[in-house]
Curated annotation (Swiss-Prot):
Family the UniProt entry places it in: Belongs to the amidase family.
Protein name (record): Fatty-acid amide hydrolase 1
Phenotype for S218A: Lowers activity by at least 98%
Source organism per UniProt: Sus scrofa
Function: Catalyzes the hydrolysis of endogenous amidated lipids like the sleep-inducing lipid oleamide ((9Z)-octadecenamide), the endocannabinoid anandamide (N-(5Z,8Z,11Z,14Z-eicosatetraenoyl)-ethanolamine), as well as other fatty amides, to their corresponding fatty acids, thereby regulating the signaling functions of these molecules. Also catalyzes the hydrolysis of the endocannabinoid 2-arachidonoylglycerol (2-(5Z,8Z,11Z,14Z-eicosatetraenoyl)-glycerol).
Source lineage: Eukaryota, Metazoa, Chordata, Craniata, Vertebrata
A molecular function GO annotation: amidase activity
Designated gene of the protein: FAAH
Length: 579
């Protein structure tokens, strides 16, 4: 009866007019929301530019007042030596901060990695505790780290103009340890990408080659640190977001166990998803700097400010150990074919470790495709992407996200139909689509239990071989700009260890050679699908770019992971910076 009345109402001339009005209203609403998004982008760029001008003026003013300062010498110091010289009084905290301000401003001109200057850092110099482990150290922060009075936009219009009311716990701890947070750095829109672009601040580029991605989602950090604009940065990682920028930009980074470092007060685009753990971790030019940062963060202040974090101080004995290690390794996960440079990096590192007295044992976690598709992707999008999509209402979708948002917007039945039709020819794409379906509470509990059981099964595999650590390939070199969003499957080497919640870090070990480049012409991948084709195309013109390996340990063994990374660095690190 109701349907008949509705049909009658819309079938006459008045109904047609009403329908036209509804369509016009919808179009007007869409235009209005897009206009608001354009306005938000314009305001964000203006604030970014004003902040950078303030930053430059502050650095220039200090330079005029201190013409004899040797900034090049200061900027070249490894972080531990820098801290030592500041503590001894040989260098002043002011000289360090303003030297890095000037360098960060210069790096930003070539990479667009800085979103804002945290101008209160100048006043903080007077308040920094002189006994802190990071006394006088300028620290850059991924934009999601909340700082009082500053936006954390995540590249989304809806977050522009909403400054944080207080510092997140990690920023509070950094300040209590004497560090000086001085800039926020760029991220991909919503942080669900391993590229680095958004409609508010634009594209961040790789300091090694401007046509290449710096990685993401901590891409601004990777670019700034690699080019010498920051001695230490903090990022987050839920699928490789610390490890991709570190590998693409040729620096070191570690993703700790999910709850080793506090996440309290961080800005996110999706809250409540716990099946796949987010981690907070440091990024720097060398492993010793990562260790210094973890020493500083794993302190009583953090355990007091966030009692949900296990009170586990940094274990110096494990990190300082020099005993030979039993190292599991695999050349491929059989999901993403390693590039010639990746395979060579892995094998050269393996040989160097063996020559140094370590034992290398073949090892491959079981059932990786299922872990990546059903468990990891299923966990990340257990609501079908509904909460993530809410961030994009009335906003532009950045091209760095590829087709993710369009796919998430498809009806559930259409995703299922496409997955069924694609499975015989494109199994990875079919697995990805089928994992995006929304789940009931009961099905989500089943998924979380399955992830827990998978974690225990891999630990059992690991212990059956009596392994200390594992060495794996790391996706590298850097892909072309906008390519990561079209090569979703290539996250396999990193995403697995978010699903497992194992600490994992990356260390640069070599660079792409002309021979690697020539062999890449024959790269087909294991499946020949669009993801494989994008990887093959997006890694061309890469001679000289850094290539990394990944080092993994069991949960809560960050110190052992760092010890292994330090050994790899000692044996392999090429020790170059982008020009």
């Amino acid at each position: 009866m109701v349907q008949e009345e509705l049909w009658a109402a819309f079938s006459g001339p008045s109904g047609v007019a009403l329908a036209c009005c509804l369509v016009a209203a919808a179009l007007a609403l869409r235009w209005s929301s897009r206009r608001m998004a354009r306005g938000a982008a314009a305001r964000a760029r203006q604030r970014q530019q004003a902040a950078l001008e303030t930053m430059d003026k502050a650095a220039q003013r200090f330079r005029l007042q201190n013409p004899d300062l040797d900034s090049e010498m200061l900027l070249a110091l490894p972080l531990p030596q820098l801290v030592q010289k500041v503590r001894s009084g040989e260098l002043s905290p002011e000289a360090v901060l303003f030297s890095y301000l000037q360098k960060a401003w210069e790096v930003n001109r070539g990479t667009n990695c800085v979103t804002t200057y945290l101008a209160d850092c100048e006043a903080q110099l007077c308040q920094a505790p002189g006994q802190g482990l990071l006394y006088g150290v300028p620290v850059s922060l991924k934009e999601c780290f909340s700082c009082k009075g500053h936006d954390s936009t995540l590249g989304l219009s809806r977050n522009q103009g909403t400054p944080a009311e207080c510092d997140c716990v990690v920023v509070q701890v950094l300040k209590l340890q004497g560090a000086v947070p001085f800039v926020h750095t760029n991220v991909p829109q919503s942080m669900f990408s391993y590229d680095c672009s958004n409609p508010l601040f634009g594209q961040t580029t790789n300091p090694w080659m401007s046509s290449k991605s710096p990685g993401g989602s901590s891409g601004g950090e990777g670019a700034l640190i690699a080019a010498g604009g920051s001695p230490l940065g903090l990022g987050t990682d839920i699928g490789g977001s610390i490890r991709f920028p570190s590998a693409f930009c040729g620096i070191c980074g570690i993703k700790p166990t999910g709850n080793r470092i506090s996440k309290s007060g961080l800005k996110g685009s999706v809250y409540g998803q716990v099946a796949v753990q987010l981690s907070v971790g440091p990024m720097a030019r060398d492993v010793e700097s990562l260790a210094l940062c973890l020493r500083a963060l794993l302190c009583e202040d953090m355990f007091r400010l966030d009692p949900t974090v296990p009170p586990l101080p940094f274990n110096e004995e494990v990190y300082a150990s020099s005993r030979p290690l039993r190292v599991g390794y695999y050349e491929t996960d059989n999901y993403t074919m390693p590039t010639p440079a990746m395979r060579r990096a892995l094998l050269e590192t393996k040989r160097s470790l063996e020559a140094a007295g370590h034992t290398l044992i073949p090892f491959l976690p079981a059932n990786i495709p299922h872990a990546l598709e059903a468990l990891s992707t299923g966990g990340l999008f257990s609501d079908g992407g509904k909460r993530l999509l809410q961030n994009f209402e009335g906003d532009y979708v950045d091209s760095c996200l590829g087709d993710l948002i369009s796919i998430l917007r498809l009806p559930k039945w259409l995703k299922g139909l496409l997955a069924f039709m694609l499975r015989p020819l494109l199994p990875r794409l079919a697995g990805f689509l089928s994992s995006l379906r929304p789940r009931s509470a009961g099905k989500l509990w089943e998924l979380q239990h399955e992830i827990e059981m998978y974690r225990h099964s891999v630990i059992a595999q690991w212990r059956a071989l009596d392994l200390d650590v594992v060495l794996t390939p790391m996706l590298s070199p850097a892909l072309d700009l906008n390519a990561p969003g079209k090569a979703t499957g290539a996250v396999s080497y990193t995403l697995l260890y978010n699903c497992l919640d194992f600490p994992a870090g990356v260390v640069p070990v070599t660079t792409v050679t002309a021979e690697d480049e020539a062999q890449m012409e024959h790269y087909k991948g294991y499946f020949g699908d669009i993801w494989d084709k994008v990887v093959q195309k997006a890694m061309k013109r890469s001679v000289g770019l850094p290539v990394a390996v990944q080092c993994v340990a069991l949960p809560w063994q960050e110190e052992l992971c760092l010890r292994f990374m330090r050994e790899v660095e000692r044996l392999m690190a090429p020790g170059r910076q982008p020009s």
